[in-house]
Amino acid sequence: MLRTSIASSRQVLSSPICPNPSVQWLHTSRARRVNAAASRRYYAVARKPNAGVRSSSTPNAAATPELSQKATNSTSTKPPGPNDPDVRSPASPSTGSTLHPETVSKPPQSPAVQGQTSPGSSVQPPEHEPSPPPPRPPPAPKTGLLRKLLYLFLTTGLAYAGGVWYSLRSDNFYDFFTEYIPYGEEAVLYLEERDFRSRFPSIARQINRRVSAPRDEGAQVMIPGRSGLSWKVAEEQQEASDVTKQGQHISATDANELTEETKVAEKAKEDVKSKPVAKKAEAAEPKSSPKVVEPHPAKAEENTSLEAPRQPVVPAAAAIEHLGLDNEDEPVVQDLVKVFNDIITVISADESASKFSVPIAKAKEELEKIGDRIVALKNDAQESAKEEIRNAQAALDKSAAELVRHINEVRAQDAAEFREEFESEREKISKSYQEKVTTELQRAHEVAEQRLRNELVEQAIELNRKFLADVKTLVENEREGRLSKLAELTANVAELERLTAGWSDVIDINLRTQQLQVAVDSVRTTLENSEVPRPFIRELAAVKELASNDEVVAAAIASISPTAYQRGIPSPAQLVDRFRRVASEVRKASLLPENAGITSHAASLVLSKVMLKKQGTPVGNDVESILTRTENLLEEGNFDEAAREMNSLQGWAKLLSKDWLADVRRVLEVKQALEVIETEARLRCLQVE
């Protein structure tokens, strides 16, 4: 016997009816687990005790039937669904709630549940399921420090690169960037140097190729602290004349000696300026030994009051030659040589000029190298300028050729468009002219017919007038002649009536004949100009209506098959094209006997591939000869003989060409009927004449 566990039902009944809203979701999950446990069923070994007997071993035996009944009701009741209106949806748990399923107190179990269900029952009480493990704590939110650092680095790099780029465009921003941003000036200078090297690669290569020679400093020269130029103009103080010092007022020989020394120095300066420019190798070498300016000895005069002047112990310094370069045509080199020569002049005027001879020589060499380098840079610049001029000239020639080609293309395109417009206009004019000519011809034809009718009417009126005049004359004559010529007058009247009726019949016959001819021409034009089989019922009905009283025309129309004028007939070109397709199939079946099978068909198909096609006008009754003769006749336009040749085929060949023969017969029938109708129309014209 199946029954529900009492312990499970007690767990269900132990849950509160109205749970706390804050922990409602916990009770809902627990209720689901309890319902799942309650749905389990067990087999009972012993019989169920009577409801009225109270067990002495259970202290709460009176409540046992009620609990079992409630458990039965709870198990038999359908579990609440999600759409049940009596069941409230669980409230969302608050984030601040710290309740856990394991912290909720369980109701105490009754002693009846702890022991057996009855004294004689051997069923063990159901074991309680272990409580579910506590949920995992929510993972800590990621701080994203590495991502922020990466974004900060990228943003800083982009801002720095943008600042460097904008510094190359704006001078104000350049000052701000290089002053307040670290390493800003180095970055901007590096980019400017790269830009300069990309613009002038030849100058950059020459700068890289230059070998810096070690500089010879020479001996150290000590310069006094207050020597050289100063920003403040020194005030020259005129010293008071000292009569105790040596001078002209004491000795006249010293003044003469000083005058001679001054003249020698000025003469040396003029000699240096008048000398030609020395070569580079000679300018680097030290010059010859300096000339010692010896003062002219003064006259030996015995002077008892003053001593004779002494000879100079140290010889005078040699004058340093000025710098001379071959490329003095450059303004920069000229200024540099001029400044350097002024410096040499100043040094030469000093007594210690010999100390500066070696540095001056080295400076000359460096200046010569600088001059050569300037010339080389100028030559390179000229070569690069020439190369750019040649490239510009080539680009100009290329663009000119491209422009000429484009102009030629545009001209050719315009000519083609003009030609197309001319052709279209010519076609329009030709078409309009043809329409105009057709209209004029139609109008002329109508005018001619109307004129003919008018002439006939005038003739009839004139005849009637003559007739009346004749009648009047005859009547008068009869009156005068007492009706002697009454019989002759009656005969003349009858003749005139007959002639008038005859002329009317002639006109009607001519009109009908012309209309019949036009209708026949319309049928023939429709058949000849149609590219596909086209019905010609209306044209044939017009012919039949115009020749309704002509038995010959009616018989010719009746001889035409209804299929021919209802569906149309193929043109000669279509017949020839279809014959070629039919001929290929007939050749495949040309070797088949009358009662041929699949093998015979296959053999005939294979052998037809190797058969030679005949040319010319072959003689014979074989299939190939008949097909060749038929094709020649079709090319000549003789469809009647071609149909006769194809009709002479036998067996499968004739069966395959049956449809083509039917089309040819219909074409020949229509052609023959049209010829008969045209002949009849001509015959009627001859009869009228």
Swiss-Prot record:
It is found in: Mitochondrion inner membrane. It is a single-pass membrane protein. Disulfide bonds: none annotated. It comes from the Eukaryota. Residues 49-142, 234-308 are annotated as: Disordered. Its main location: mitochondrion. Residues 169-689 are mitochondrial intermembrane. One of its GO terms (biological process) is cristae formation. The chain crosses the membrane at residues 149-168. Residues 1-43 form a transit peptide. Residues 360-505 form a coiled coil. Residues 56-148 are mitochondrial matrix. Residues 53-78, 91-100, 111-124, 240-256 have a biased composition (Polar residues). GO terms for cellular component: MICOS complex. InterPro entries: MIC60. Residues 260-285, 293-302 have a biased composition (Basic and acidic residues). Keywords: Coiled coil, Membrane, Mitochondrion, Mitochondrion inner membrane, Transit peptide, Transmembrane, Transmembrane helix. Residues 131-141 have a biased composition (Pro residues). Component of the mitochondrial contact site and cristae organizing system (MICOS) complex. Component of the MICOS complex, a large protein complex of the mitochondrial inner membrane that plays crucial roles in the maintenance of crista junctions, inner membrane architecture, and formation of contact sites to the outer membrane. Plays a role in keeping cristae membranes connected to the inner boundary membrane. Also promotes protein import via the mitochondrial intermembrane space assembly (MIA) pathway. Belongs to the MICOS complex subunit Mic60 family. This is MICOS complex subunit MIC60. The lineage of its organism: Eukaryota, Fungi, Dikarya, Ascomycota, Pezizomycotina.
